[in-house]
């Protein structure tokens, strides 16, 4: 309820005041009530009466009307007769007038004083009534003057920002008060044509700029108040001082900067101006001393400047006009002439007082202090803006950058599946991985003379004096069945010791399952990369289309100085070329024959000294082979005794039947040799023809130590060995017995290991096949027989063997043949019959790289065709 009562009371009071403010007129008798006072037609005071309009029935003879403090907002037009108004003083101060025009007072032609102070006036218009009105037409002459008697206009304490426009229309205006407003600057035409203006009050404004020609036409100007403003520059005021030498000016409370212009104009300004400037500059200098702490000397009146003659300043002339009141005269010329005088006086600025120079220095120091602050502010703003922009860009562009990165990663991911493969080094290995049959891989590798080994391990050789371990074909079976022992039929003459030795070799190979792969790969590569040093017979024979009769073997076991151990392999024994086992058998034949001949020739002459020489030769061979960087698998085996080697040689290499057609050991030679594989068919037993007594292996060695041969045998021992070998053919067995007795003392390892070594082969038929189209021929899968034709000068027998099983494309050996070349097919297997090797070792040479060239063993046969016989004879001559 209380809130309701309060609301009702508020509404009633508001309506009451609203009715008072909106009341437009009063009755005619209100003029004479006690609210307004008048003094016999002289003064009418209606201030603080609360009236909102000018009284309409005031006395026409009243000279002054005071309607101040009546909350006037708009001055309305009077309803009285225009002819009756005699008002001279109108006070409208302390009201709420915000905008005013002087048109309502146009009928007050006698008005002299208009007070509009203490209002909210921010705009003042001096436009009068339109000339179309009847009253203006009747009083045209008086209206033209537009307040002809208005002398005082008071506009102080309002909200003016500029000087009122159109003041020149007030022709009789003598005093103008614009103090306590918000005026910023004075325009050069604001007081133009105000010829009667004497007093101008502009104090307490915000004026910071006054042009020198602003008061140019104010000839009667006597007093000007510019105190409490924002004026700084002295030069415009000096020009005004030159134009109005007797002008009373109040310049206090401004931010004057006293410069050299004060000293320049000391002798040209009036005494009053000089005193004022001295006071102003001393005050400003004192304030600077108090603020800066730097003592400054005051400008004294006795400060003398260089004499300046007035005749040089033609621009300064005396004004002819004199004021009647004081009889004072001022010499003022035009603004342009005074500017020239000022520019001429600036040339004397070098000899300025110390105070003036110090003031300039203070200003420069202030500017220098402000410069770092501005720089710091600029840097801070730039850093902030940069951070803001970078943050915005990062926030908006991050999703797009992530998407682009994901797309880039996805585009690169398929490329990871493309595994790198070095075709130059691993083309054969990749081919072996893709082909299911290793034999087919060998067929692909051999015709192209691949320089690298496949995944099938080879025989690994290690140099060792007087020791040769060559497991027979039962090694393949021992890999499959480690516990099984070798049958007597398979072991030949040494059935008892073969099983133990094979088990020892197998156990060693089990400890090194991949040693053969690594060791033989490096050995085969080193052997192939040094084809030129090993001898030129391989490529020369292909280029000249000559039959091959000898093969150089880069394994040191051929010379009797290394162990030959087959590497462990996960493939079946038929994956490798069986002919290579025949080659190592032939190489062992040569080694044993060489040892036998050497022991036979030297046993009678040197006796016990033969063994020491042989040991030294073996040690030198071992050092030479180590230096050739051939990585070999070191397998410590007992050295074979000379007696076992001689017994194996005297046995004429008995022929043993196959125990298992698939049980073939890995080849000792890498697939670099240009030799084919000859397999005896299963449906045909090997036939041994007559073997002459002169088919023993012959030895021929080059013992020139200057050429760096493998064995540094003396020429005497070499010739003796060769001669003894040739003479000892009839009584071969007796010499073997003698040499066996001489070498039995040098055996330091297991003697039974040699008994396991059985040199077996199927005498193959060597056949030279020529391609009419001069292209490599691959053996047909359905061919069941392979023949080998060889002729030796002393051999006329022919041995022909057939494979116990037909050759298939999967396990068929190499059948590539070159025109003009012999392709020798060798095969070693366990045969049930005893066969003899007919070896021709006439050209056993030792190369400079410790590789022994040897002639592959082959059973000699007499060709049935005379042409073939002649051809074989020529080949044997070449081999010799």
Swiss-Prot record:
PANTHER family: ANTIGEN BSP, PUTATIVE-RELATED, INSULIN LIKE GROWTH FACTOR BINDING PROTEIN ACID LABILE SUBUNIT. Residues 709-720 have a biased composition (Low complexity). The chain crosses the membrane at residues 4-24, 376-396. The keyword Nuclease does not apply. It comes from Homo sapiens (Human). Keywords: Glycoprotein, Leucine-rich repeat, Membrane, Phosphoprotein, Repeat, Transmembrane, Transmembrane helix. Residues 337-354 have a biased composition (Basic residues). It holds the Pfam family LRR_8. Glycans are attached at residues 45, 115, 746, 756. It is a multi-pass membrane protein. Its main location: membrane. Residues 697-707 have a biased composition (Acidic residues). This is Leucine-rich repeat-containing protein 66.
């Amino acid at each position: 309820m209380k809130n309701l009562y309060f609301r009702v009371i508020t509404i009633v009071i508001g309506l009451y005041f609203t009715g008072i403010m909106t009341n437009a007129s009063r009755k005619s008798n209100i003029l004479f009530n006690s609210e307004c006072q008048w003094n016999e037609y002289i003064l009418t005071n209606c201030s603080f009466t609360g009236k909102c309009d000018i009284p309409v029935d005031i006395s026409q003879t009243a000279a002054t009307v005071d309607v101040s403090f009546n909350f006037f907002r708009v001055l309305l037009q009077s309803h009285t007769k225009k002819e009756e108004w005699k008002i001279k003083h109108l006070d409208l101060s302390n009201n709420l007038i915000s905008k005013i025009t002087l048109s309502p007072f146009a009928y007050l032609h006698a008005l002299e004083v208009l007070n509009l102070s203490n209002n909210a006036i921010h705009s003042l218009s001096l436009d009068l009534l339109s000339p179309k009105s009847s009253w203006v037409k009747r009083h045209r002459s008086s209206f033209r003057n537009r307040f002809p008697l208005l002398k005082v206009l008071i506009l102080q304490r309002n909200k003016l920002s500029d000087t009122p426009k159109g003041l020149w229309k007030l022709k009789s205006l003598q005093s103008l008060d614009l103090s306590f407003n918000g005026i910023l600057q004075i325009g050069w035409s604001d007081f133009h044509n105000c010829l009667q203006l004497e007093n101008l009050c502009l104090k307490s404004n915000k004026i910071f700029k006054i042009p020198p020609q602003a008061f140019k036409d104010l000839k009667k100007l006597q007093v000007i108040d510019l105190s409490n403003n924002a004026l700084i520059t002295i030069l415009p005021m000096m020009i005004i001082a030159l134009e109005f030498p007797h002008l009373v000016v109040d310049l206090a409370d401004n931010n004057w900067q006293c410069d050299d212009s004060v000293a320049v104009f000391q002798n040209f300004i009036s005494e009053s101006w000089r005193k004022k400037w001295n006071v102003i500059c001393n005050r400003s200098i004192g304030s600077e001393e108090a603020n800066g702490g730097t003592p400054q000397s005051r400008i004294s009146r006795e400060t003398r400047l260089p004499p300046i003659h007035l005749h040089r300043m033609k621009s300064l002339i005396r004004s002819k006009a004199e004021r009647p009141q004081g009889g004072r005269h001022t010499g003022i010329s035009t603004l342009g002439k005074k500017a020239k005088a000022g520019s001429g006086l600036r040339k004397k600025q070098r000899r300025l007082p110390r105070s003036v120079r110090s003031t300039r220095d203070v200003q420069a120091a202030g500017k220098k202090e402000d410069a770092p602050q501005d720089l710091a502010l600029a840097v801070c703003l730039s850093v902030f803006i940069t951070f803001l922009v970078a943050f915005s860009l990062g926030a908006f562009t991050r999703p797009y950058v992530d998407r682009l990165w994901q797309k880039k990663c996805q585009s690169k991911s398929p490329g990871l599946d493309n595994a790198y493969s070095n075709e130059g080094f691993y083309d054969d290995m990749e081919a072996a991985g893709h082909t299911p049959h290793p034999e087919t891989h060998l067929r692909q590798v051999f015709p192209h003379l691949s320089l690298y080994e496949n995944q099938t391990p080879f025989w690994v050789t290690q140099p060792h004096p007087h020791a040769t371990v060559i497991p027979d074909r039962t090694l393949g079976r021992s890999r499959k069945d480690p516990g099984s022992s070798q049958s007597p039929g398979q072991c030949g003459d040494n059935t008892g010791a073969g099983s133990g030795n094979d088990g020892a070799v197998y156990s060693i190979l089990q400890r090194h399952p991949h040693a053969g792969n690594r060791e033989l790969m490096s050995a085969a590569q080193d052997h192939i990369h040094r084809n030129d040093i090993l001898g030129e017979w391989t490529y020369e024979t292909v280029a000249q289309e000559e039959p091959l009769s000898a093969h150089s073997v880069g394994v040191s076991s051929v010379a009797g100085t290394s162990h030959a151990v087959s590497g462990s392999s996960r493939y079946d024994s038929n994956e490798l070329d069986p002919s290579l086992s025949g080659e190592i058998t032939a190489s062992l034949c040569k080694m044993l024959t060489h040892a036998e001949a050497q022991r036979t020739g030297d046993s009678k002459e040197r006796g016990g000294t033969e063994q020491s020489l042989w040991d030294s030769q073996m040690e030198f061979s071992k050092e030479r082979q180590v230096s050739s960087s051939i990585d070999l698998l070191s397998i410590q085996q007992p050295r074979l005794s000379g007696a076992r080697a001689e017994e194996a040689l005297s046995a004429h290499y008995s022929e043993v039947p196959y125990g298992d057609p698939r049980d073939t050991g890995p080849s000792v030679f890498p697939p670099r040799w240009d030799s084919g594989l000859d397999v005896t068919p299963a449906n045909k037993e090997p036939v041994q023809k007559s073997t002459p007594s002169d088919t023993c292996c012959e030895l021929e060695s080059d013992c020139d130590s200057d050429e760096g041969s493998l064995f540094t045998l003396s020429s005497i021992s070499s010739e003796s060995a060769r001669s003894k070998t040739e003479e000892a053919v009839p009584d071969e067995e007796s010499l073997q017995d003698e040499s066996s007795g001489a070498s039995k003392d040098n055996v330091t390892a297991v003697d039974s290991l040699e008994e396991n070594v059985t040199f077996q082969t199927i005498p193959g038929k060597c056949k030279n096949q020529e391609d009419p189209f001069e292209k490599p021929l691959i053996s047909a899968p359905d061919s069941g027989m392979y023949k080998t034709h060889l002729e030796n000068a002393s051999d006329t027998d022919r041995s022909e063997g057939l494979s116990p099983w037909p050759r298939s494309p999967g396990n068929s050996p190499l059948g590539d043949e070159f025109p003009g070349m012999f392709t020798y097919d060798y095969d070693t297997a366990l045969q049930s019959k005893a066969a003899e090797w007919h070896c021709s070792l006439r050209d056993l040479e030792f190369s400079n790289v410790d590789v022994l060239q040897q002639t592959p063993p082959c059973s000699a046969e007499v060709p049935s065709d005379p042409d073939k016989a002649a051809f074989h004879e020529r080949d044997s001559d070449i081999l010799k």
